[in-house]
Amino acid sequence: MKKKIFLGLFAAIHICGLSIFTSCSKNNDEKMLGVDTTNRVDNYSDMDNLVESLPFSELQGISVGNAQDNDAQTGVTVFFFPEASMASAVVLGGGPASREVPLLDPQRNTQPLNALVFSGGSAYGLAASDGVVTSLEEHGYGYNTGYGLLPIVCQSCIFDLSYGKSNIRPDREMGYKACQNAIASNSPLSGNVGAGTGATVGKPGGMATAQKSGIGYAAARLGQLEVGVAVVVNALGDIFQDGVKIAGMTTIDRKGFVSAEQAVLKNQYSDLIAGNTTIAAVFTNAHLSVADLQKVANIASTGMARSIRPVFTMADGDTVYAISLSGGMILSDVNTVGVLASLVMEKAIADAILASKIADEEYLHNI
C-alpha cells in the first residue's frame, strides 16, 4: 500500500514538473525554487541579437599560414600562437592520425602550445610537424628546457590519399613553409587551401559519389567573449546547414543526393568507408583551465553532430581542439563558451563546403 502511494505521489510531481513553464502555478513554483522572475524574458526570440558575427582574422593571439601542392591536391595549415597558449582536445572518431594529443590531457604535464598543425596525407602527413618545429626554433619559439628550445606542436591529419596524387603527401618542407607563412602574416583562407585542399565528404559509396569539401572558418562575439572555429571537413557523412543538406553522397549520375546515413544502415558500402576525418579547433579569449578546455571541445562537437550525418564513426578520425589564446583574459562560464563554440562550429562547417565547391568535371578528374 505504501509503495502505491509513493508511486502515485511521484507521478503527480513528475506531471507537474513537466508543465512547470506552462501551468502548476508556474510563478509560485518558481518563487519557491528561489528563481527571481522580476526581469525574466519569456520570449527568447531576441537572444540571437546578443551574438555578433566576427571576422576570424580579428581574433588576437593567433596567426594562420598555409602551404599546399595544387597538383597533388594536399596541403598543410598551421595555427601559430605568438604567445604559447593552453589547449586540450577530444578524439571522437575511431581512426585518428595525430601527434602529441595525449599531452593535452588534463592529467598530463600540459605545456602551452606554440602551434597546432592540420594537414592532409593521413599518417604520412605527420612529417609536416618536423618542419614546423624547425621553423619555430629558428624564430626563437618553444619551451626552454635549459638545454635549448623545445617547440610544443600538436597535429591532426585527414585522409586525402584518395583525391589527387596519393604518392605526394605533406612533408617537412611543406610544414616549414606553412609555419613560415603563419609567422609572417595571418591568412585564414577558406576552401581548397592548406589542409582543406584534398578534403571530401559523403563517402559511403566511394569517391565517385562523394563531393569536394575544404577548410572553413567562423567566429562570433558575445559581450567581451570571443570564439572562433577552424575546421577541415573530410567526413564520411553528409553535410547540413540549418537542417538542409548542402553536400555529401550523391546518386551515381551525380544529379541528386543519397542519404549517407541510410547507406550505412543498409550496409551496402562497408568495404569502402575507411579514410575520413573532420578536424576542428576552437579558439577563445576566455581564461580556462585545461580541464575546462577539454569540456569546451566536447560541447563544441555537438555542432559537428548537427551538421554532419553520420559523424564520429569508426571510419572517421574526428578530433576537436580547444585553445585559450594568449592565456585568455576574459572570465567566462565553460558552458557559455562551449555552447557558443558549437554554434560557431556549424557556421565554420558550412563555410568549408560553400567555399570549396568545384565543377564535377574537375572533381572527377582528381579521383
Q: Over which residues does each language-model region extend?
A:
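Bacterial N-terminal signal peptides that target proteins for export
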Residues: M1-F10
